[in-house]
Every structure is written in C-alpha cells, then in structure tokens.
Amino acid sequence: STVLDGVSGMNVISPTWFFLSDNEGNFVSIGSKDYVEQAHSRGLEVWALLDNFTYDVNTKEILSYTSKRANLISGLVNEALALGVDGINVDLEQVSTEAGEDYVEFLRELSISCRANNLVLSVDNYVPKNYNAHYNWKEQGIVADYVIIMGYDEHYGGSQEPGSVAS
C-alpha cells in the first residue's frame, strides 16, 4: 500500500504476474488476491500482465497450435477470475515474423474469452516500425480493448536525471 501513497490520477495498475513457463501454454502465476483487494479499495483496476521473457520458452511453438493456445487462454482466464483482477495485459515480446498470424489469432481467441468473462484485454506493443508490422496493430485494435505502445529511452537506471523509462 505504501507504493501507492500519494499517487493520484491513476486508474489502472498492471503487475507482471503471469509468466509463460513452457512450450505447452502453461504459465506461472504470482498473483495476489490481497493485492487486488487493496488496489480495488483505492479505486484502481488491476490488469494482470503476461510475459514471455522470464522463462526460456518458444513463443512460436505455443502460438502455432490451437490446443496450446486454448490451454493458455483457459488458464489465464481461470486465474484472472480466481484472483479477481479486472483484465489481462499481454506483453509478448520478440514474436517472430513467422509467428505473427498465430499471435494475432491468439489475441482474437483470448478476446472472445475475456469478453465472455467481463475481463479487459490490453496488448503491449513496440513502437510501430516496418520490421514489426506482423504484430498487426489494426487487427489488435479490433479485438483488444486497449492497444498500448511502449515508448522507451527517456531515462534509464543510471540516468543523471530522474524520470520515467516509458510514457
């Protein structure tokens, strides 16, 4: 709770709680119901973040199979509901060009399940460039509730000037 003391103007917090852990679509969760309850008591929504860079996984292997995507989606939604979070924030990075269509299909399928369970779906993205066009931001905008562009390089850990690392 002390992290949020004095914070104003914020309505969503997205803790990194879900980590892809193998190539079958399983993940590790470090989510906390108590954290969610505290955030809700402060008027904040909680969107649990899924990442693919904590464990050594092959994202293409997971996304290429309907059964593995279904396993991941079912697990994510069930865990989100068990924790009482308001949404799921997808931060899958370094998705290969070859996996682009499967990635977008995963987002389509996840969006259906999220909507059916009243969960917000947001997707984190690099700044759009030609080399990452396979992330298909137009389609993301159709299926996700929020498409987030991660802007970096404003400040860094050793920077002489304090400030955010992204805006």
Could you say what each language-model-derived stretch is?
Residues 23, 97-167:
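Substrate-binding surface in catalytic domains of secreted glycosidases
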Residues 17, 48-52, 92-94, 123-127, ...:
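A cross-domain feature marking catalytic cores of carbohydrate-active enzymes
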Residues 42, 83, 116-119:
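Helix C-cap/helix->beta junction micro-motif
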Residues 32-37, 73-80, 104-111, 137:
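Generic structural signal for well-ordered alpha-helices
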Residues 1-75:
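Glycan-recognition patch characteristic of GH18 chitinases/ENGases
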Residues 2-7, 77, 134-143:
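Mature extracellular/periplasmic domains of secretome proteins
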Residues 11, 86, 145:
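Receiver (REC) domain switch/active-site residues of two-component response regulators
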Residues 13, 90, 147:
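Conserved, mostly hydrophobic/aromatic
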